[in-house]
């Protein structure tokens, strides 16, 4: 999945999205901090390819995008919006194909601007990136192709604190960055970073009023952070081969960025450091049981600002949760299955 699959809704309840065969499932808290609902299918009976892009606006609404199989080996993109975790999401709505018609290409990435408009980014087979953006009063703008080439199937979209949408993508020799210059505008290709990135390791996070930070693992195995305009910094050696998740949170009165990753041992590893101060260093602490190889981790904060972490495995369907204890430091509650 591309994007945060553990989210806090507008009403403060937590919910998760999981891939399951040819469907997307959702589970949510029945009440804040309480029991969870059973899994339910998102968007009706539409069959999907096992890919999902997720974005959330400041209004708390979740936007989901996937590919659906069609006739003659072709596929099309579909979109659903989820307004309240305890209610059903809208049915999947076809939104087309970047080339009008054709086969499935890369996994979509989704970001939602300050006006609540979803922006869907899709990598193409020819190394381009296409954008589909919602209109403010309903409907969709035409597909647009962003500048840039040789893009690989690894996108990370984010919305800055300004409310403007940004996108990062890997290319064979680095990372490309696009940013909206004003709300509603097409993102513009900015500077590129020359580096070697492990596939599937990009994660973007808003870290200040003016900046987003993209995290990635380089080919030497270091987890790095880059803010356009600055030099990249090594945060810590990566704990494992997969993607990282990140969230900004308050730890003992300090604005910190918390990282989580499935470690090489199969457990979840956590590391924290002062936000945008990578030079302070970070170190991993492992937590919880050993997980299946396809398990991923996602982070968010609850209504009280408390960190919550979840792990999900498509092969087993297992969903585990933990939360930070109400005490100094980063001590976590025991992991529990829901």
Where are the model-predicted features located?
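A structural motif
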Residues: 1-338
């Amino acid at each position: 999945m591309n994007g945060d699959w553990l989210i806090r809704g507008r009403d403060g309840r937590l919910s998760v999205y999981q891939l399951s065969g040819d469907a997307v499932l959702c589970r949510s808290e029945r009440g804040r901090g309480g029991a969870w609902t059973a899994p339910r299918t998102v968007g009706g009976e539409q069959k999907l390819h096992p890919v999902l892009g997720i974005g959330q606006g400041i209004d708390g609404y979740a936007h989901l995008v996937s590919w659906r199989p069609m006739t003659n080996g072709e596929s099309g993109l579909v979109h659903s919006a989820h307004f309240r975790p305890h209610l059903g999401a809208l049915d999947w709505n076809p939104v087309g194909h970047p080339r009008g018609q054709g086969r499935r290409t890369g996994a979509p990435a989704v970001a939602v601007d300050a006006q609540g408009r979803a922006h869907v980014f899709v990598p193409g087979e020819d190394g381009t990136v296409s954008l589909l953006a919602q209109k403010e009063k309903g409907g969709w703008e035409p597909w647009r192709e962003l500048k840039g080439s040789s893009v690989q199937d690894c996108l990370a979209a984010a919305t800055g604190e300004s409310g403007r949408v940004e996108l990062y993508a890997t290319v064979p020799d680095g990372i490309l960055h696009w940013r909206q210059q004003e709300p509603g505008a097409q993102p513009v290709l900015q500077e590129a970073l020359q580096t070697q990135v492990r596939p599937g390791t990009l994660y973007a996070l808003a870290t200040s009023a003016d900046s987003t930070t993209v995290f990635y693992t380089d080919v030497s195995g270091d987890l790095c952070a880059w803010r356009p305009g600055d030099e990249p910094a090594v945060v810590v050696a990566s704990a494992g081969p997969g993607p990282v998740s990140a969230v900004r949170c308050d730890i003992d009165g300090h604005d910190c960025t918390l990282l989580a990753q499935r470690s090489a041992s199969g457990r979840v590893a956590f590391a924290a450091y002062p936000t945008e101060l990578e030079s302070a260093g970070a170190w991993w602490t492992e937590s919880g049981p050993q997980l299946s190889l396809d398990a991923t981790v996602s982070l968010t904060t609850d209504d009280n600002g408390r960190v919550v972490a979840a792990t999900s495995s498509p092969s087993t369907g297992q969903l585990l949760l933990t939360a930070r204890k109400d005490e100094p430091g980063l001590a976590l509650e025991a992991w529990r299955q829901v």
